[in-house]
Amino acid sequence: MKSYLRKINYYETDQMKIVHHSNYIRYFEEARCYFLECINYPYAKLEEEKIASPVLSVSCEYKRVVKYPDELIIEVMLTELNKVKATFEYRVVDSKTKELKAIGKTEHCFVNEAGKVVSIAKTNPSFYNALVNELEFSIEK
């Protein structure tokens, strides 16, 4: 699990200073990018190696309101992995109170620059092994 610290910006909120629901998906992406940086495979490196990882599905369950100027910890875990697909799960918690604010999940495949699904174990075994080393049990279990 990797923990990504995120301060809420005023522009992400409505007139009641409540974070708009669409921003959580961005927070998941930021946390996932941080996760990849932590394992020495930032998106820039993957792009250089002609690999992309498009989102196949995304879900978010909102538990508690997030407001400006809250500070969040987005916990991201790789919970499922095979040669062509990866699943990440997220827990969004208040950095001070540790109150759970949201949970989420994203599923991704691996494609080459032509957009064709590829086996990451074959096309980039070092990246695949780095992911295998991070594989954890589901947050929901």
Predicted regions and their residues:
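Catalytic cores of transferase enzymes with a strong primary signal for eukaryotic protein kinases
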Residues: 15, 42, 72-75, 113, ...
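Hydrophobic beta-strand-centered segment that forms part of the acyl-chain substrate-binding groove
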Residues: 35-86
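Solvent-exposed, charged/polar functional surfaces in cytosolic regulatory/catalytic domains
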Residues: 34, 61, 130, 134
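Catalytic strand-loop segment that frames the active site of acyl-thioester-processing enzymes
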Residues: 1-37
